[in-house]
Amino acid sequence: MHLTDKQIEDYKNLGVIIIKDVFKDWIEPLRLGFQKVLNDPSKHGRENVTDNKGRFFEDYCNWQRISEFKDCIFNSQAAQIVAEATSSKSSQIFHEHIFIKEAG
């Protein structure tokens, strides 16, 4: 998958583009990775509990220990899309950050 010239121009002008179905094959593997993080959070993992119903959990910097995250980073089209959208020769991951908000 390559971005169109219009998508690249839209990204430059708007800072955002919608690309449908690019990551659909990654949903289930990433869901498994999220569950692994929930079962074994990193030192950055936080449960943000308030009087509101519904759990809110966040964690980050797990891509090196959660194989599903690392696999997506290195084997999905994410890096290529970012490089094309920004007209860069490469892209670099700083860290991933997950947020899980349950209903309520």
Language-model region placement:
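Non-heme Fe(II)-dependent double-stranded beta-helix
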Residues: 1-13, 20-104
